[in-house]
Amino acid sequence: PFIFSFSGVSESPSEYASGMIKDNGNFVADVSGIYTIVAAFGGREARRTLQVSARNVTEKVQLKGHGTVSNVHTSDLWVWEGIDGRDYCVTGTWGGNGEAYFWDVTDPNHLIPIDTIRVDARTVNDVKVSEDGKICVISREGASNRKNGLVIIDVSNPREAAIIATYDEGLTGGVHNVFIYKDHIYALSNGERYDIINIEDPKSPKKVGTFELDEPGHSIHDVWIEDGIAYSSNWAYGVWMVDVGNGMAGGTPSNPKPIANYAYPSGWNHAAFPYYDKKTGKFYVIAGDEAFPNGLNTEDGPTIPAGFLHFIDFTDLERPVEVAKYEVPG
């Protein structure tokens, strides 16, 4: 078989001439510069040098509004349309006093804080709201009683958000991320697995299923559900697609079934989102990295993250392939 490789020099001395070359010789550069592509077969090789220019595909981003939380780090957020037709947002907190803040964001130029929920936790890392806009779930880490788990909140009226249940069975190691999909909460347990909790009666949550990799030293950071498929991000073990109700593999919330997976060398897989391209019929999962090459600064200065967005073609579930990646400026 042919063996393909490349080398290059970037236009900017501050950037490394990186890129990607596939087994069929398709090449894409991450930064502009001069690159040499080499194809080798046996004792012979051919090479071609080419100039790669930036596409300059840019768009200005305009700040419309700013909801200030000055005394604690904000962790995550979720925006939804309330049952009254107005737009709302809930934000979590990191390393604070276990607070979640609720906002009216109907006018993006004027974000209005409308309520606060405080729970026993140091960090409310993740916040999600059900599709019907009635139920919110927040995660807990660092609880004084070490039970952690999650908290279920009635947000039918976000101005009077009310806790209606807590759940910590099997989740005492801390819940870092959660997701709500069709009367079920998917909650990460201590970075090892996700438990699936039925909330058809949100006042009486009950566990109905779980999914955990059968791999040495496995861990998980996030899970996202769409069309009955759970997309989990598992650091070194990459992205896993699991049937939790879609039907393609016979999975249900109480009996999740793996569909496909893909891992990449860095092992930084932190989040994943599905995308179907209607024009081409291709199905992709965009996998995001989490990396802090200069360390994590939480006290006296900014933290500069790094890493890539990986575009993985899952059209052929048996042969997923990474087709491109984008380096996040850092």
What are these regions (language model features)?
Residues 33-34, 47-330:
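Feature marking well-ordered beta-strand scaffolds used for ligand recognition
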Residues 1-57:
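Extracytoplasmic soluble-region selector
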